[in-house]
């Protein structure tokens, strides 16, 4: 089991020899020995080196996350959001304007009375229906589409009923 014992790392000595001019080694060598013994000083120097390496990678992380790359990435995301909103608004306005087409399916979407009028008092021919299939909308959407289309055809009649009679005022 003594074979598996972790020995003291020799990173410090390797850095001193291999990378003598590296900025981390220069900062490590500025550590003041003070009144420490040589053994304590080597341990503290090793700990300081670990801190310097961690600090170096943390600064690199901050540069990457807060620097130019991060700002460019965030700006790209911000630029995409208005386009997505504009697409949604244009689709909704196309639907409201009546240019949004929906294929019809056979059979009426709501029951009609014998006089050819549905329960809302609008003729059955003005009701649009949605197609059935694997990609069709839910029955609640069918009802909403039916109601919106009947409202669009009934709206001029309601507006005409609200107009005051055109005549001379006394």
UniProtKB/Swiss-Prot annotation:
InterPro entries: Herpes_capsid (IPR009299). Pfam families: Herpes_capsid. Keywords: Capsid protein, Host nucleus, Virion. GO terms for cellular component: host cell nucleus; viral capsid. One of its GO terms (biological process) is viral process. Interacts with the major capsid protein/MCP. This is Small capsomere-interacting protein. The gene is SCP.
């Amino acid at each position: 089991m003594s074979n598996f014992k972790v020995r003291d790392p020799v990173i410090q000595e390797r850095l001193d020899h291999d990378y003598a001019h590296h900025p981390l080694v220069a900062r490590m060598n500025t550590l003041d020995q003070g009144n420490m013994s040589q053994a304590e000083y080597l341990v503290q120097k090793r700990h300081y080196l670990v801190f310097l390496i961690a600090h170096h990678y943390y600064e690199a992380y901050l540069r990457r996350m807060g620097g130019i790359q991060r700002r460019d990435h965030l700006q790209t995301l911000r630029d995409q959001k208005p386009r997505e909103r504009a697409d949604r608004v244009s689709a909704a306005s196309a639907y409201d304007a009546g240019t949004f087409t929906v294929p019809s399916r056979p059979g009426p979407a709501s029951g009609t009375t014998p006089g050819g009028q549905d329960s809302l008092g609008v003729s059955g021919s003005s009701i649009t229906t949605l197609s059935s299939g694997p990609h069709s909308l839910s029955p609640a959407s069918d009802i909403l589409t039916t109601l919106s289309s009947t409202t669009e055809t009934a709206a001029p009649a309601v507006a005409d009923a609200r107009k005051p009679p055109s005549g001379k005022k006394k």
